[in-house]
Amino acid sequence: MSAVAETIQTEMPSPILFTDSAAAKVADLIAEEGNPDLKLRVFVQGGGCSGFQYGFTFDEITNEDDTTMTKNGVSLLIDAMSYQYLVGAEIDYKEDLEGAQFVIKNPNATTTCGCGSSFS
């Protein structure tokens, strides 16, 4: 009698939520630049009124320590240091009466400033 081990593969949820709205806006911006190799890099750096601040830039290069996520054909890059601060976060794009901007909702942030781009 032979035993067959059944392997069940489950897809783990992404530790960072990159919304459809954010992916669509990034796709529009990449199309405007005319460079399909661009990826959105999201990072955390020291600064801002609460100690850390979020940053966004386009990058063509994926570094060895980057975590890469893809949503609707758009790639998001996060370096290893920033990743630890962004686990569980939602990266969204909002348009309202106050303007249009990328927004990060981060459950790891204990305090945030009024501008929403700085946290501790």
From Swiss-Prot:
Database matches in Pfam families: Fe-S_biosyn
Entry keywords, A to Z: Iron, Iron-sulfur, Metal-binding
Any one Gene Ontology molecular-function term assigned to this protein's record: 2 iron, 2 sulfur cluster binding
InterPro entries (alphabetical): FeS_biogenesis (IPR000361), FeS_cluster_insertion (IPR016092), FeS_cluster_insertion_CS (IPR017870), FeS_cluster_insertion_RrpA (IPR023063), HesB-like_dom_sf (IPR035903)
Cofactors that this protein relies on: iron-sulfur cluster
Binding residue positions for iron-sulfur cluster: 49, 113, 115
Cofactor note: Binds 1 iron-sulfur cluster per subunit.
Keyword Iron: yes
GO biological process: iron-sulfur cluster assembly
PROSITE patterns in the cross-refs: HESB (PS01152)
Keyword Signal carried by entry: no
Record HAMAP family: Fe_S_insert_ErpA
Family statement drawn from the similarity comment of this UniProt entry: Belongs to the HesB/IscA family.
Oligomeric form and interacting partners: Homodimer.
Function of the molecule: Required for insertion of 4Fe-4S clusters.
Name of protein: Putative iron-sulfur cluster insertion protein ErpA
Source organism of the structure: Albidiferax ferrireducens (strain ATCC BAA-621 / DSM 15236 / T118) (Rhodoferax ferrireducens)
Lineage: Bacteria, Pseudomonadati, Pseudomonadota, Betaproteobacteria, Burkholderiales
Gene: erpA
